[in-house]
Amino acid sequence: MPKIEVKNDDLELALKKFKRISLEVRRLAQRHEYHLRKGMRLREKQKIAQKKRRKFRSLASH
């Protein structure tokens, strides 16, 4: 479980940091959940990149 120190009673910043760290931990656990062949791993990586591009393109248009 990630630990975050709250400095200067700044709870909002501490929550942001905690969410970011816990998300990284979940992604790492999900990635190592089972073994993927090299080609499959590359396809998964490309899918994730494509989703990110779509997300940021839709945000840029607003």
Swiss-Prot record:
InterPro entries: Ribosomal_bS21 (IPR001911)
GO biological process, one term: translation
Keywords noted in UniProt: Ribonucleoprotein, Ribosomal protein
Ribonucleoprotein found in the keyword field: yes
Statement: the UniProt record of this protein carries the keyword Signal: no
GO cellular component, one term: ribonucleoprotein complex
Coiled coil regions in record: none
GO molecular-function term, one example from the UniProt record: structural constituent of ribosome
Family in the record: Belongs to the bacterial ribosomal protein bS21 family.
Protein name (record): Small ribosomal subunit protein bS21
Originating organism: Mycoplasma genitalium (strain ATCC 33530 / DSM 19775 / NCTC 10195 / G37) (Mycoplasmoides genitalium)
Name of the gene this protein is made from: rpsU
